[in-house]
Amino acid sequence: MAREDELRDIHEALSGDGSRRTVVLHGLGGIGKTQLAVAYAKRHKDNYSAIFWLNMKDEDSLKQSFAKVAKQILREHPSASRLSSVDMKHLDEVTDAVKAWQGLPYNTRWLMICDNYDNPKLATNKDIAALDITKYLPEAYQGSVLVTTRSSEVEIGHLIHVTKLGDVRDSLKILSNTSYREGLTDGKSSST
């Protein structure tokens, strides 16, 4: 994986004492923020008791994501009693139950990835559909949150500006990995 510096920055910012840590990856659309979040989650999955993915494109997508997270929690942690009693059709209740589970005193090692937070509620954003991410974070100040956004104005944690790849070898490494063509970085590629 290319972007080793960014991966190291994310890891350092999210490593801590059990209190909530938040990293915001911001940059142009298509620059690689989501792929960076995926790479971080894969690389550090053993550091977390659970990893959740929320699509923050709009409120409907977000609430559907919370329903999927609730089902994941019930599969992986069947003793989550509040979640087992929630009607999955009532998405506001599901969201509250997930936030309550995340806020349990012993539950400090989860990672929540908030992807596509591109319409944030800000003083400069007058869109009525804009989302306030803080409404969807647990009230307890614990766990890790990784946000991807196009907005450089989302200031809820450690900001990392994701830019285009500066080193052509990093670009070739990504191309090699995604195309399953070995050796692109050293000039030897198999023609398939």
Give the role of each language-model region:
Residues D5-R20, G27-L28, V38-S49, E59, ...:
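A conserved switch/coupling segment of P-loop NTPase cores
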Residues S190-T192:
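Amphipathic alpha-helical "lid/sensor" segments that cap RecA-like P-loop NTPase cores
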Residues W53-N55:
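Conserved beta-strand segments of the P-loop GTPase G domain that flank and frequently precede/overlap
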Residues K33:
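Conserved lysine of the Walker
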Residues E59-L83:
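Conserved NTP-binding/hydrolysis module of P-loop NTPases
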